[in-house]
Amino acid sequence: MKKIILASSSPRRREILSRFFDIIVHPSNVNEDKIKEKDPTETAIKIAKAKAFDLAVKFPTDTIIAADTIVTLNGKILGKPKDSEEARKMLKQLSGKTHEVVTGYCIISGDKIIEGAEITKVKFRELSDDLIEWYISTQEWRDKAGGYGIQGFGAILVEHIEGDYYNVVGLPIIVIIKLIELGHKLKRIF
C-alpha cells in the first residue's frame, strides 16, 4: 500500500489526518507568498497544488496530500498576522461579521490528481476590546490565517459556523473521504 505523505508543517493538519491514517509528514519548500490569484479559492488551490507537486517528484510511488487555508472578509484575504498589532486589527475587522475560510487541497496518487476547495462561513460574535486583548495574550493567533484558531481559545470568538468545522481547523473531511476512495484503509484504533 502506498504511504500517505502530508506536505505540510501544520500541526493541525497532521493531527486531523493522523486520527484516520498512518502518515508521514514532509513539508514542501514552496514559497506561498509568490502565488497570488484574484480569487482566494483559486489561490488556495494553486498553493496546494504547488506543494503537492513539489513532493510528488520526491515520492512518486506514494500518495501526497497538500492543503492551504485562507481567511477572507468581503473578498479580502486575511493572512497570518506578522505581530500582535496586526492580529488585533484582524480580530477587530472580523468582530460581529461573517467571513469565509477557504481550504484548497490537492491529492496526488500515481496518475490521479484530485483537487478542490472547501468553504466554511464563520460568524464572529461582537468582540469587546477586553476579549480581543485577552485572546492576543494567549499567543494563539500566531501562525493562524485570520489571526485565530477555532480549535482552541479562539472558539470563544465564534458565534456560529456554516459548513465543515475541520475545514476551519485546516483540513476538510472531504480529503479523508477522497483517501478512502483511493483505497487507503482507515487505521485501527482499538
Curated annotation (Swiss-Prot):
Q: What is the top EC class of this enzyme, as a single word?
A: hydrolase
Active-site residues?
Answer: D68 (proton acceptor)
Pfam families for this protein: Maf
In this chain's numbering, which residues are marked as the site (Important for substrate specificity)?
R12, T69, Q151
User: InterPro entries, alphabetically?
Assistant: ITPase-like_fam, Maf-like
Instruction: Extract the HAMAP family matched here.
Output: Maf
Record PANTHER family: BIFUNCTIONAL DTTP/UTP PYROPHOSPHATASE/METHYLTRANSFERASE PROTEIN-RELATED, BIFUNCTIONAL DTTP_UTP PYROPHOSPHATASE_METHYLTRANSFERASE PROTEIN-RELATED
What is the name attached to this protein's record?
A: dTTP/UTP pyrophosphatase
Query: Which species expresses this protein natively?
Result: Pyrococcus furiosus (strain ATCC 43587 / DSM 3638 / JCM 8422 / Vc1)
